């Protein structure tokens, strides 16, 4: 839809409030009306939309180092074995059926015979195994490899303690895929939406760093769209996969994803008519578009928090971590950062539902802790830093985005006022921030985690001793045990109790993280676009069956 529109150069505003004033003035003057064409068809009659997304990070290899790019690419281009719709019902995709043994340890999936790669070749069980085997090589950099560990011998293979031949994945024929688990895993079906359980064409997908994943000649897809073009740091284009088994239900011919450095330029691009959808925008946009049909709000199943590096003194002292947690005024923080935020004291996302009760999971237990500045000062004194004296200057690294910059400034001021400690702020480009965190190169580091699947394990697993995302040096045998016990607990009430105990230990007793806030998803969507769906596991928008009405 946006391809024929007038374009303009986007420049990052260094004064976000000035940007808001200018945008408000333009809206008031009636200049910013979206600028959309009357038709969603290009000159040759094809239907297309353009979507603004955050900076280019990560690979498109399901076995590789997944980050933001994959989250836009995969929902449109890849079919998992099955998923769940918004009503919790199974929706078959690459699989047509499955069976599970009485002990819930053997899962057999029957694949569609009509499922084809975008080049017309069959999708087979070996393509699923290809991703799994490559992800279990630590050199792949897959942060999702830990979610393969329920499979028999997968963890041993990852740690170099078992041979690949012992992996509990069987492919007796091209269209049968069998998983044998070490123990029953009650959320195994939820894991299937993760990249490491998706196929990669064994003809081309070899290693995670060979470049095959962003090369349209070798990057095949088994979903509604395939990769047509990828220009690093600028955009990538998906085109309709005519070989898709459900191609008749796919309405769009093309989706272009454009990369933007920050939410301000994303919103500006929407207003200029350069894009049809802009997601995860700032609360300023929510205020400006109140009452307009372009505004599309969602509950993000995500938590914004900070990692403490336990290997940096004095953050190895639980009293210091607790003091910092108790000294932060989250209500004040959210008032300043934006009305799309809400204070949280949990790691598990505020808006994640408990599948058994239908209520928010975090409402099923007491709040892990309460803010208390007086107690925070006592704890800091007990740790040897009365009135903050002698406390070293710590550096907080965060992405150079408006919301994160505002958050950092508030935290710096609150910790100075309440504990008399100094925090040095270091804004980083998004990819650099990701790399610093992944390498453990930080004192304090911003983290934002959107759920990968609809279970609290997606959050609690991140603090396990063997997790790729455990960047803080956490090694807690009691915590590991609680989470492990929850894996195989079939009683949903008992399992929830174990998960709540694990979170209380990590967040309310050991204070391994500094939870900040939950967020509403602030999105701008061209009203002519229909059929956008919301992923119930992540809260993200999906476009595989979207259409344009004009």
Predicted regions and their residues:
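N-terminal lobe/hinge region of extracytoplasmic solute-binding protein
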Residues: 52-102, 220-221
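Structural transition elements
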Residues: 341-382, 401-405
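Detector for C-terminal structural segments
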Residues: 327-356, 403-412, 435-550
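Aromatic- and charge-enriched surface segment that lines or borders ligand/interaction sites
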Residues: 96-147, 178, 314-316
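Gly/Pro-rich hinge or "lid" segments in bacterial periplasmic/extracellular proteins
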Residues: 85-86, 166, 174, 181-250, ...
